[in-house]
Amino acid sequence: MKQKIVLATGNLGKVKEMSDVLADFGFEVIAQTELNIESPEETGLTFVENALLKARYASKMSGLPAIADDSGLVVPALGGAPGLYSARYAGVDGPDADAKNRAKLLHVLHHIAPTHRQAKFVSCIVMLQHEHDPSPIIAEGECYGEIGFAEKGENGFGYDSLFFSPEVNCTFAELATSEKKKISHRAKALSVLQTKLATKGA
């Protein structure tokens, strides 16, 4: 029998990407939206703090173990922006948020030369057995690339169509989901999580 765990996100892209992998770990993933749990205000100053906030809240509201991911795009030429504010970079919510965020990123980078458009995706995953778990499992992953001058690809979500990965010589949005799962920041963090779970005997 699989262990139920609440995934603390309402982002459908993350739900699919993480559910595919977590199912292999023996977990039955329930998105917090299925339980009518809303996300708390993200007041942390780091990806780890925000992931902890979300996981603790989801566990508190559901009474189940919880897992949360906080991730973002870091562009050194912009002083680390969008960073913690990647999901709300353009200041809008709703179905148009991703497109508006990408448009803003292209706009603020329009004068930046190709040699200075480096970027990295960061993912921090936190897993709790219960709301007050004193020793949460924390797993982090990063992947490096650069921001293109135009969107390419139809797959993925968020900034995927702008993030060019030298490792695969295309944007994340040009990859099939199965290919992205092998190299993405979230995939790397989930791999670290899997190792830590095995070590902990969870």
Swiss-Prot record:
Enzyme class: hydrolase
Known partners and oligomeric status: Homodimer.
GO biological process, alphabetically ordered: nucleotide metabolic process; purine nucleoside triphosphate catabolic process
Physiological role: Pyrophosphatase that catalyzes the hydrolysis of nucleoside triphosphates to their monophosphate derivatives, with a high preference for the non-canonical purine nucleotides XTP (xanthosine triphosphate), dITP (deoxyinosine triphosphate) and ITP. Seems to function as a house-cleaning enzyme that removes non-canonical purine nucleotides from the nucleotide pool, thus preventing their incorporation into DNA/RNA and avoiding chromosomal lesions.
UniProt GO MF annotations: dITP diphosphatase activity; ITP diphosphatase activity; metal ion binding; nucleotide binding; ribonucleoside triphosphate phosphatase activity; XTP diphosphatase activity
Alphabetical keyword list: Hydrolase, Magnesium, Metal-binding, Nucleotide metabolism, Nucleotide-binding
Gene3D superfamilies hit by this protein: 3.90.950.10
Record-listed E.C. numbers: 3.6.1.66
Keyword Metal-binding recorded: yes
Name by which UniProt lists this protein: dITP/XTP pyrophosphatase
Species whose genome carries this gene: Pasteurella multocida (strain Pm70)
Residues given in the record as Mg(2+) binding sites: 41, 70
Family under the similarity heading: Belongs to the HAM1 NTPase family.
